[in-house]
């Protein structure tokens, strides 16, 4: 209906005028919203001017009355009443000459008075439907549906407003309004159904459409005359009376419209007309036509027990069909139409006959209609199963985590204990399924641990089928618990699942019984992907890399050396290797040069023949020789000579194992160049030289390559250089991308406009063309890594991803397959290192102490690939701003959804019952503002949700404790206590909550019933009932990380540590005033590796010594301590590797004494803001120290001289310390470098006298203004040492 633009213009006018009033407030906005709603409803009635019923019942009178009201202001009403109302309202509402309240009150009074007058004489339309002579254009179903949509939109406004200060607020329960809304929506579905199914318009259809229009208009009038109560200040009708009015209206709908014309007769007539000519169904989504909504209409409220079975089946059909495209059905759509129409005829006939005779039975209806319900129910049953199973199966993602069976087996065991009554009828079948899955666990383990076996494809196909069956079992078991599927259907479905699992096992057993000789056959056929490198291709960039590699080839060790070059696809590894291989200065130093390209799938014989051809020439007779003779021939050919071999594109270690025996080592400086995408292969092949990870291009190299490829030997025009530089930068430093774009530019006119167009569209072109290369790397990923890799598509562009968070998400998503004796986190780290080794993931940060990856990110090309491929695989779907919810019907179900706004989550929630993960990604990367978001009612639709990661961006009003499948929850809260119902989330493994403000959060004792918790992170929490915690004997054996409990007493800390015996990381805050002697040593869990301890009150003494035999990382902050305390603590921390002291004051006249043997394994010592003057360190202390960092230790006199003699020391950093500390640091550097030849040593000085020298790079950097003479002295001194 064409009123949106006018209303939008009207709203803008309101806003313009309200800005002119002295006070701009929410009240003003509420008034504007009120008037807009009133006018939108009136607009609906104005579109009914051509209908007789609208005139006879008085609907048009009220519109005319409004026009007459306009005339009272001595201004003739314009043709467009809306334009006139807009002008009038602006004058009355916001006139400067009168108070805004006066204008508002006046206009509201006029509206309400008119409603009162009309309500007294309004009645339901009584006109005979047959007498309604209307134009075809007005009675078409499109108009009826458009009118119903407008009414639904107006009612939705009243339902959604929960703010009592709004003039549109409706107090009390809104169930009646919601029921009316449902009726209207189902009526629209019925109209759409009839419209889509009828071939030619008939009398029955016209009658039905008119009736639908009468019902919708009457609903709109009843609501408009009586609601909203606050806005109209309705004193004569209370909210309860309005609800009663609506309820009475609902009952009236099933009565006769007038004698001789029954509503049910109209529906029966139209359904019988459709039944006689069921057309070929359109191949569209079933939900678009409301194909099964009609029989489950609210008329079924009064159904007798005889119809209950039919109602149950039809509801199941409706609920499952809504997500299923017609094209995926395994039967004719006409069959479903026939079933639905028959069911509708049964229902409406039942009501029609019940109206005539109260004791009407089902048999009476069957005789009247001429068919048997019992017989007709059977095809409905069959159809229901087909639809339900197909709807579920077609919505499953095609990529799965192999750890899903682990999760299912644990839940099946728990379910049988928790819901024994629900499982009573199906216990035997479920136990059979449980045993079958347990028997398949060894097979899944082999798939993960031996991904490159001969039957890789078959193994992965079987593994995916197993995981899909696990998802199906979860769905059926949940339906068993929640009574979502009748028992007659569950039994058959479970039996079919058992049969399917048996078939999968037979396939696996058949694979395992293949003849042993077949198992040893290496499926290495000639690859169509193998390529011959271009020998003379000129390389641009990597000048420094080439020089280093040339030096390794010509010099270095006398023994054989394999120089491995690895990096992601498109970096230019092959081009770089061929540049060296064809370099005359290199080739001239070798007796034999030979090369081969291995590729992903290769023939061992072909590789040997290629190398022999380069070494001794072509000989066709060699192809007839067996592989072992060819290998021996090659080895003998190379044995006495110095050789250079290029082995390009090696994909796995086994390929290198096949070839390495052919390359003898006789200490004659023979060299092998090997290129690979995978770090693990490069490392495996390296002998003396470290693998070279080929970097990306820098800015200058990117531009030079682009210019070279586009202009050849010529230079770029100055007019094009700016846009050219921008294009080169947008290529992401990837040589392959640069070459692809250069190919596009070479074919275009050398005009700025053309290049600008390329720059604007660069992302799409680059990524589409690069996809084939990335796709090849993805294709060869083992099954268990594919889901891990695609999951990166859930992160934002250039986002630095915290590894701890990533691994927790992977585990919660069941991507990690368990292995006996190994932690899931350790296995996940191995998965990540594998992806890094394949150059699919870039490391952005590693831990200084152990080198473990702490953060990573994906290159844009790879990120886009992950997003696109994940969507294709039904794995992950991004829902962005303003994306239509109608798109859900054109997509299958996705296992994971990433939203950019909470509003999108609200709109899509109704279509996400099978979604497993919801991830909120805020592009602004900052917390969204309060107030708290009401989330509980939305998440009820996500019944299988396992991951809810709101990234601390959204404040939620409550914790969704109904989602018992949930394994990962991350959000922000504003409550000061966690509800005891949190224990309902008995599958929860990771709970991360952040508070909007700094306060203590009370944790209920029921948390200790959540035995699957692995990671618990809540700021400043304390037990709500310490006595209950003490009495509760449960322990969280699986809990590994805990932050941040607040301990006011040592006893509290002792208690919590006893409850968490397997902690590995603890961040806590303590406020212990005094420490009793019996607690002199606080024993932390034996597995604890990381401890961060903060004092709530600065510079109080830590009242206990820390005992943690396996602690590796300790951070103490805001404390007061002495040498004795640290000495006694050190005695209990023999394996400590990292010690960080922040804001610490020392007693004993600000002195710290470190005795011999203290901190024997310490590698990193960081001291920041220490109140320390004198530091005395024994000669044998810190024997393995590698890094010393001093920040803001302004009172410290010097660094102890014994640091000069620590052989492991590599790095000292001094920031904002006094001059004597800087001098002592430089003296340590001098001794380390000159006396001990420690060329790896690096000193960084920041702040006063900030002169930084890097001995390895022979570089000096001044980071602040320093006296020039002093800089000169430092430079001369460093030059004498050969350091610059």
Swiss-Prot record:
One of its GO terms (cellular component) is cytoplasm. InterPro entries: Apaf_helical, Disease_R_plants, HMA_dom, LRR_dom_sf, LRR_R13L4/SHOC2-like, NB-ARC, P-loop_NTPase, R1A-like_N. Its main location: cytoplasm. It holds the Pfam family WH_DRP. One of its GO terms (molecular function) is ADP binding. Keywords: ATP-binding, Coiled coil, Cytoplasm, Hypersensitive response, Leucine-rich repeat, Membrane, Nucleotide-binding, Plant defense, Repeat. Residues 533-555 form a coiled coil. Residues 1217-1284 form the HMA domain. This protein is encoded by the haplotype B genome of the allohexaploid Solanum demissum. PANTHER family: AAA+ ATPASE DOMAIN-CONTAINING PROTEIN (PTHR23155:SF1152), DISEASE RESISTANCE PROTEIN RP (PTHR23155). This is Putative late blight resistance protein homolog R1B-16. It comes from Solanum demissum (Wild potato). The gene is R1B-16.
């Amino acid at each position: 209906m064409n009123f949106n633009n006018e209303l939008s213009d009207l709203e803008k006018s309101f806003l313009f005028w309200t800005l002119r009033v002295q006070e701009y407030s929410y009240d003003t906005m509420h008034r504007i919203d009120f008037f807009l709603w009133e006018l939108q409803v009136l607009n609906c009635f104005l579109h009914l001017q051509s209908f007789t019923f609208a005139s006879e019942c008085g609907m048009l009178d009220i519109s005319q009355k409004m026009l007459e009201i306009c005339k009272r202001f001595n201004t003739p009403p314009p043709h467009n009443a809306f334009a006139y109302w807009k002008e009038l309202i602006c004058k009355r509402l916001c006139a400067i000459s009168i108070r805004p309240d006066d204008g508002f009150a006046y206009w509201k009074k006029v509206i309400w008075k008119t409603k009162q007058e009309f309500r007294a004489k309004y009645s339901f339309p009584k006109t005979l439907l047959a007498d309604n002579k209307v134009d075809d254009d007005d009675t078409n179903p499109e108009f009826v549906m458009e009118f119903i949509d407008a009414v639904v939109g107006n009612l939705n406004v009243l339902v959604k407003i929960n703010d009592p200060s709004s003039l549109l607020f409706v107090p009390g329960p809104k169930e009646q309004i919601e029921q009316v809304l449902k009726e209207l929506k189902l009526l629209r579905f019925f109209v759409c159904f009839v419209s889509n199914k009828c071939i030619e318009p008939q009398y029955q259809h016209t009658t039905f459409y008119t009736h639908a229009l009468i019902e919708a208009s009457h609903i709109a009038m009843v609501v408009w005359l009586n609601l909203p109560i606050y806005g109209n200040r309705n004193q004569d009708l209370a909210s309860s009376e309005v609800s009663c009015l609506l309820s009475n209206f609902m009952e009236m709908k099933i009565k006769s419209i007038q004698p001789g014309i029954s509503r049910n007769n109209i529906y029966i007539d139209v359904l019988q007309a459709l039944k006689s000519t069921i057309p070929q169904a359109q191949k569209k989504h079933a939900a678009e036509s409301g194909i099964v909504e009609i029989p489950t209409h609210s008329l079924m409220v009064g159904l007798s027990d005889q119809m209950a079975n039919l109602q149950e089946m039809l509801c199941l059909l409706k609920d499952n069909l809504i997500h299923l495209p017609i094209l995926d059905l395994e039967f004719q759509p006409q069959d479903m139409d026939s079933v639905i129409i028959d069911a509708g005829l049964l229902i409406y006939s039942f009501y029609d006959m019940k109206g005539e005779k109260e004791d009407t039975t089902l048999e009476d209806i069957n005789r009247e209609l001429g068919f048997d319900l019992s017989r007709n129910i059977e095809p409905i049953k069959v159809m229901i199963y087909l639809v339900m199973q197909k709807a579920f199966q077609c919505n499953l993602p095609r990529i799965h985590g192999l750890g899903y069976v682990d999760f299912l087996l644990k839940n099946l065991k728990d379910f049988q204990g928790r819901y024994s009554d629900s499982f009573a009828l199906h216990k035997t079948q479920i136990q059979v399924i449980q045993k079958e899955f347990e028997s398949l666990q060894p097979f899944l383990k082999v798939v993960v641990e031996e991904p490159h076996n001969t039957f890789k494809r078959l193994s992965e196909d079987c593994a995916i089928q197993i995981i899909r069956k696990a998802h199906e079992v979860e769905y059926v078991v949940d339906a068993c618990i929640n009574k979502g599927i009748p028992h007659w259907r569950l039994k058959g479905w479970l039996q079919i699942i058992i049969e399917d699992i048996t078939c999968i096992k037979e396939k696996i057993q058949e694979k395992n019984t293949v003849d042993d000789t077949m198992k040893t056959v290496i499926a290495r056929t000639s690859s169509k992907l193998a390529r011959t490198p271009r020998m003379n291709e000129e390389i641009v960039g990597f000048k420094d890399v080439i020089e280093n590699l040339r030096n390794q080839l010509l010099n270095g060790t006398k023994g054989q050396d394999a120089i491995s070059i690895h990096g992601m696809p498109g970096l230019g590894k092959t081009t770089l290797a061929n540049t060296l291989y064809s370099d005359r200065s290199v080739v001239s130093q070798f007796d034999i040069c030979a090369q081969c390209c291995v590729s992903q799938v290769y023939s061992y014989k072909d590789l040997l023949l290629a190398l022999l051809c380069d070494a001794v020439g072509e000989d066709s007779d060699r192809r007839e020789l067996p592989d072992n003779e060819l290998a021996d021939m090659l080895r003998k050919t190379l044995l006495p000579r110095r050789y250079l071999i290029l082995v390009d594109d090696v994909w796995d270690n086994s390929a290198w194992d096949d070839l390495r025996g052919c390359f003898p080592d006789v200490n004659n400086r023979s060299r092998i160049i090997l290129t690979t995408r995978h770090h693990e292969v490069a490392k495996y092949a390296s002998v003396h030289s470290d693998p070279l990870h080929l970097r990306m291009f820098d800015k200058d190299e990117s531009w030079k390559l682009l210019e070279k490829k586009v202009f050849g030997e010529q230079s770029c025009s100055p007019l094009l250089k700016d846009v050219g530089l921008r294009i080169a930068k947008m290529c992401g430093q990837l040589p392959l991308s640069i070459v692809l774009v250069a190919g596009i530019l070479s074919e275009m006119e050398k005009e700025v406009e053309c290049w600008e167009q390329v720059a604007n569209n660069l992302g799409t072109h680059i990524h589409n063309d690069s996809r084939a290369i990335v796709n090849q790397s993805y294709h060869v990923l083992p099954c268990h890594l594919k889901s891990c890799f695609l999951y990166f598509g859930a992160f934002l562009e250039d986002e630095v991803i915290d590894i701890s968070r990533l691994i927790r998400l992977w585990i919660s998503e069941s991507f990690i397959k368990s292995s006996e004796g190994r932690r899931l986190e350790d296995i996940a780290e191995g998965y990540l290192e594998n992806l890094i080794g394949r150059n699919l993931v870039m490391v952005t940060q590693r831990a200084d102490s152990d080198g473990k990856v702490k953060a990573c990110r994906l290159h844009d090309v790879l990120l886009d690939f992950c997003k696109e491929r994940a969507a294709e695989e039904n794995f992950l779907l991004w829902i962005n701003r303003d994306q239509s919810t109608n798109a859900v019907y054109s997509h299958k179900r996705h296992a994971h959804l990433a939203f950019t706004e909470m509003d999108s989550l609200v709109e899509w929630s109704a279509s996400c019952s099978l979604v497993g993960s919801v991830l909120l990604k805020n592009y602004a990367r900052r917390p969204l503002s309060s107030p708290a978001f009401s989330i509980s009612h939305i998440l009820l639709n996500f019944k299988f949700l396992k991951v809810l990661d709101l990234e601390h961006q959204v404040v939620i009003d409550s914790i969704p404790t109904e989602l018992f499948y949930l394994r990962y929850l991350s959000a922000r809260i504003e409550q000061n206590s966690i509800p005891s119902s949190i224990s309902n989330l008995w599958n929860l493994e990771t709970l991360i909550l952040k508070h909007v403000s700094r306060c203590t959060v009370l944790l209920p004792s029921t948390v200790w019933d959540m035995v699957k918790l692995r990671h618990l992170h809540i700021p400043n929490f304390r037990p709500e009932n310490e006595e209950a915690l003490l009495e509760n004997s449960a322990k969280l054996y699986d809990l590994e990380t805990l932050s941040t409990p607040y301990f006011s007493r040592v006893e509290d800390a002792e208690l919590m540590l006893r409850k968490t015996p397997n902690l590995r990381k603890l961040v806590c805050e303590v406020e212990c005033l005094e420490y009793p002697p019996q607690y002199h040593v606080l024993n932390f869990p034996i597995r604890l590796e990381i401890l961060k301890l903060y004092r709530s009150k600065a510079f109080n003494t830590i009242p206990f010594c820390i005992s943690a035999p396996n602690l590796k990382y300790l951070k103490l902050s805001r404390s007061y301590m002495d040498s004795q305390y640290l000495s006694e603590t050190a005695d209990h921390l023999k394996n400590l590797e990292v010690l960080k002291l922040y804001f610490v004051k020392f007693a004993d006249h600000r002195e710290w004494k470190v005795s011999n043997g203290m901190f024997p394994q310490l590698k990193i010592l960081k001291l920041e803001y220490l109140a320390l003057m004198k530091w005395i360190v024994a000669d044998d202390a810190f024997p393995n120290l590698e890094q010393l960092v001093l920040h803001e230790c302004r009172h410290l006199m010097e660094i102890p001289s014994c640091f000069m003699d620590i052989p492991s020391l590599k790095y000292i950093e001094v920031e904002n310390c006094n001059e004597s500390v800087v001098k002592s640091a430089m003296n340590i550097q001098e001794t380390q470098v000159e006396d001990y030849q420690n060329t790896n040593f690096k000193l960084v000085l920041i702040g006063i006298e900030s002169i930084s020298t890097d001995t390895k790079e022979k570089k000096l950097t001044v980071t602040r203004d320093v006296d020039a003479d002093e800089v000169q002295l430092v430079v001369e001194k460093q030059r004498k040492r050969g350091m610059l």
